[in-house]
Amino acid sequence: KKFGGFLXXI
């Protein structure tokens, strides 16, 4: 969850 929920949630 670094970029608003992009990357899957990282």
Swiss-Prot record:
Expressing tissues: Expressed by the venom gland.
Origin superkingdom: Eukaryota
Keyword annotations from UniProtKB, A to Z: Secreted, Toxin
Keyword Secreted belongs to the record: yes
Keyword NAD: no
Listed GO CC annotations: extracellular region
One function term, GO molecular function aspect: toxin activity
Entry's localization field: Secreted
Name under which the protein is recorded: Toxin To58
Taxonomic path: Eukaryota, Metazoa, Ecdysozoa, Arthropoda, Chelicerata
